[in-house]
Amino acid sequence: MTAITDERAIRETIDHYSNGMKSADVASLKNAFHELAILCGYIGDELIAAPIQGLYDWVESNSVPEGYTCTVLGIEITGRVATAKVRETDLHGDVIDHFHLLKVGDRWWIVSKIWDAEPVEE
């Protein structure tokens, strides 16, 4: 793949994530995350770390607010490794995600999601 087609494929992977979050569709999320993916980040002062199943469980038991958005802020590719910076709104406040991706065969997979979120004031 060329850099342009790799970037397009990475954006498609992030679209699977975004669509899965918007519609609480775990199958779509599973099209974004490698089966060994991990999560680690902050919501306020609380540190959360878990295997990817933790996100799937959360999505199955929670609803995402109607105003949820997911915007790619940037992508950097180095061979078969990439980093994508993404902003999510109306999930737990304003969240900046750093997705780390690996190209496995011809497919890009998110292998880690690292984030920092300031919680929404209730």
Residue ranges and their predicted role:
Residues 5-9, 38-96:
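Surface-exposed, charged secondary-structure patches
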Residues 1-27, 31-35, 47-48, 122:
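Short, low-complexity N-terminal intrinsically disordered segments enriched in polar/charged residues
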Residues 20, 66-69, 74-78, 109-110, ...:
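Low-complexity, flexible helical/coil segments
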Residues 94-122:
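Short beta-strand edge/turn micro-motifs at domain boundaries
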Residues 33, 88-90, 114-115:
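Short beta-strand segments enriched in hydrophobic/aromatic residues
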